[in-house]
Amino acid sequence: MRKLNHALLAGALALACASCTAEKEANYQVIPLPQEVSLTQENPFKLNENVLIAYPENNALLQRNAEFLSEYIQQATNYAPKTKAIAAGEQVKNAIVLGLDPSIANKEGYVLTTTPEGININGQTENGVFYGIQ
């Protein structure tokens, strides 16, 4: 009986120590899983009824992505974000800005960044931006 108690105590101690050192694994509900997620201490971007979805002018595929995102947000929140074509380098606030970035390694890769003023979704291609939207 004493050996059984010692074995149970040793097992409980091992489990307690293991649970103290185990890292929590995030459960992101996106496919494919992001390769990297970085958190900052900045205030979050707050979606509101005046949010704008911007995309580069003369890019019909990103315009279609912007319209898709607008419809998605409207279904989820009842906000109806307007979409707007913007010139290269034009700055907008309270916006979700879609764009292309040829430095992204994967053709279907994307980088999503948030600030208190807005969200940027950049992809190497329009498909990458679409995956970032999802």
Tell what function each PLM region has.
Residues 1-29:
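Bacterial Sec-dependent N-terminal signal peptides
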Residues 20-134:
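Contiguous, structured surface segment used for ligand recognition
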